[in-house]
Amino acid sequence: MDVTRLLLATLLVFLCFFTACSHPPPGEKLRDDRSLRSNSSVNLLDFPSVSIVALNKNSKQISRKEAEKKRSSKKEASMKKVARPRTPLSAPCVATRDSCKPPAPACCDPCASCQCRFFRSACSCRVLSLNC
């Protein structure tokens, strides 16, 4: 029992000492805040003021029209894509969705590539991108 009480008393003294040392007195905290304020190089008066401007209906309509023009021009640009000329088919090639294991020749479709699954046991020519 005496050993248990001695350990508890030691623990209590240690906790009291730890809490007393970990919290600074209130006077030091105020001095630190003042020194931080005086040492700070950024001053709020250095920044320009911000003004808030209300939009009228006319400005909103113009921005909507401009946005619609941009959208339509982007759509037209995507529609006007020129089809790339296809390379001539070489005689030894693999058709799309057929097996193309590594000793086999390349895929016939220029937009297709050989994809292998299950540790290269099942390979087939597949078209990856629709925009090609």
Swiss-Prot record:
Domain of life from the UniProt record: Eukaryota
Gene3D superfamilies assigned: Agouti domain
InterPro entries: Agouti, Agouti_dom, Agouti_dom_sf
Keywords, comma-separated and alphabetical: Disulfide bond, Glycoprotein, Knottin, Secreted, Signal
Gene Ontology cellular component annotations, sorted alphabetically: extracellular space
MF-aspect GO terms: melanocortin receptor binding; neuropeptide hormone activity
Region called Disordered, residue ranges: 61-87
Cystine pairs: C93-C108, C100-C114, C107-C125, C111-C132, C116-C123
Location in or out of the cell: Secreted
Pfam family, one: Agouti
Domain Agouti: 93-132
SMART domains named in the record: Agouti
Glycosylation sites: N39
Skewed-composition ranges (Basic and acidic residues): 63-79
One GO term (biological process): melanin biosynthetic process
Presence of the UniProt keyword Amino-acid biosynthesis in the record: no
Signal peptide: 1-22
Alphabetical list of PANTHER family matching this protein: AGOUTI RELATED, AGOUTI-SIGNALING PROTEIN
Function: Involved in the regulation of melanogenesis. The binding of ASP to MC1R precludes alpha-MSH initiated signaling and thus blocks production of cAMP, leading to a down-regulation of eumelanogenesis (brown/black pigment) and thus increasing synthesis of pheomelanin (yellow/red pigment).
Domain characteristics, as noted in the entry: The presence of a 'disulfide through disulfide knot' structurally defines this protein as a knottin.
Protein name in the entry: Agouti-signaling protein
Species annotation: Macaca nigrescens
